A protein has these predicted regions:
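Extracellular, repeat-based ectodomains that mediate carbohydrate processing or recognition
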Residues: 1-433
């Protein structure tokens, strides 16, 4: 819990970091926080600021000039900070173009030194690039959705100068898979510290025929692991054996008949946790938040955490009428992390969510004292009257976040798939000074 009475409100005006992009906010090794975002004018920006010291000047740089292709809030950019301090930002249109663009800084931690814009051309429309550094192999890994229902993997051995040919690791049709959400995790190994990529995937809540959330892991060498760590025959680098068979993945949640689900969060730290919202289509009263945790060889769904209260865009008819406020998992260990000394039973989980009760919109934190079986309200971080056409959505926890800035969210008017939205990225920062 951070001290709201000591915290100051900070805003990034007209900033949106929505949708299936991880990582998009990172606390770098230099102690500064970097957030990549898209504006309602379709501009791609990076913000740099210090969440520890209020006297440190902040900086902001625009990487892409106004482009209506990017005005859709689904075009939030993906951020990657390499081990050597160079910063990479990747951005695409929302299924509008066959091109993916990116820029990399020439100097470490210097957002004023972004080099030229690079472009990767795909065979079909590309969306939702998710970019990470694999420090073991000294590679940049890129996951992206192609043709709306296929996911491809590429890697670069020379910091983005050249890229491998793509391998398809997920394939579906219009009634199947749409969304793949992956988080890089730092894990203990017999040799010290390792990396793995924990993911969850599912289909569109309205369009898909299978409303099941599934999970898996890629290790640092590209092998697909089951949730209990067993290696399968699937490998991202083997074009003949790169495709995941959905039925072989672990099931996190299978919707009861007549209901559907939205995947909301994949935890970047242990234990394995996935956040979701279950509901009946067109029934706002039915939306319930849950957190699933992997324990003793199986996924266990929590008791209901809270009711979402309403959809973000209930009057739209393009699929976005199923969007809800959102959830994010705390980044940390200790009081609200996984404490192996006591079995993880004391405040072992913390999560953030946004919801409404019809009268107010809330940003709240919840904590579990029983290894994720149930959650109780810990703190109301933000509360806004419902009558101002202002909503709260998409809580986001920066990678490596400290408690000076444990979470930020979006606040403003919401309109999906267009440039008609207008919101700020809002946060409460508890500075040290």
């Amino acid at each position: 819990m951070f001290l709201i009475d000591r915290a100051r409100e900070v805003r990034i005006k007209r900033a949106n970091t929505d949708w299936w992009i991880n990582e998009k906010a990172i606390v770098a090794s230099n102690g500064l926080t970097y957030i990549a975002y898209v504006t309602d004018m379709g501009e791609i920006h990076v913000k740099e600021f210090d969440a520890k010291c209020s006297r440190t000047p902040s900086r902001d740089v625009r990487l892409c000039r106004m482009n209506c292709t990017y005005a859709d809030e689904h075009n939030a950019p993906s951020l990657c900070i390499l081990e050597n301090g160079r910063i990479m930002v990747t951005y695409t249109g929302h299924a509008q173009t066959h091109t993916l663009n990116y820029r990399i800084t020439e100097r470490p931690y210097d957002i004023m030194s972004f080099g030229k814009e690079y472009c990767i051309t795909y065979e079909n429309n590309v969306t939702y690039a998710q970019v990470f550094e694999n420090t073991k192999r000294h590679e940049i890994w890129m996951f992206a959705r192609v043709k709306s229902v296929t996911w491809e993997f590429r890697y670069s051995k020379d910091e983005g100068e050249t890229w491998s040919e793509p391998t398809t690791f997920l394939k579906s049709d219009a009634g199947g898979l749409f969304y793949f959400d992956v988080r890089k995790q730092i894990i203990p190994t017999t040799d010290g510290i390792g990396e793995q990529w924990f993911f969850a995937l599912y289909g569109h809540p309205r369009i898909s025929s299978d409303h099941t959330v599934r999970s898996g892991i890629f290790d640092a060498d590209g092998w697909l692991l089951t949730q209990d760590g067993k290696r399968t025959e699937v490998n991202l680098f083997d074009s003949d054996n790169s495709e995941i068979q959905l039925e072989k993945l672990d099931k996190v949640y299978q919707s009861p008949e007549g209901t559907t689900v939205r995947l909301l969060a994949v935890s970047p730290v242990m234990p394995y946790r996935i956040g979701l919202a279950a509901f009946t289509l067109d029934n706002a009263d039915s939306i319930v938040y849950y957190a699933a945790e992997y324990n003793c060889g199986k996924w266990v769904l929590s008791e209901p955490v809270a009711k979402a209260g309403d959809f973000l865009a209930p009057n739209q008819t393009d699929g976005s009428q199923t969007y809800v406020g959102g959830m994010a998992f705390y980044y940390g260990v200790g009081e609200a992390g996984f404490n192996s000394a006591d079995g993880g039973v004391i405040d072992s989980n913390r999560l953030y969510l946004s919801r409404t009760d019809g009268e107010y919109w809330y940003m709240e934190s919840y904590v579990s004292h029983d290894c994720g079986k149930s959650y109780e309200l810990e703190q109301i971080i933000r509360k806004i009257p419902n009558g101002k056409n202002i909503k709260i959505w998409r809580p986001t926890v920066p990678v490596y976040a400290q408690d000076n800035l444990p979470v930020y969210w979006h606040e403003g008017s919401y309109s999906a798939h267009t440039g008609g939205w207008n919101c700020d990225a809002v946060m409460l920062v508890e500075y040290d000074d």
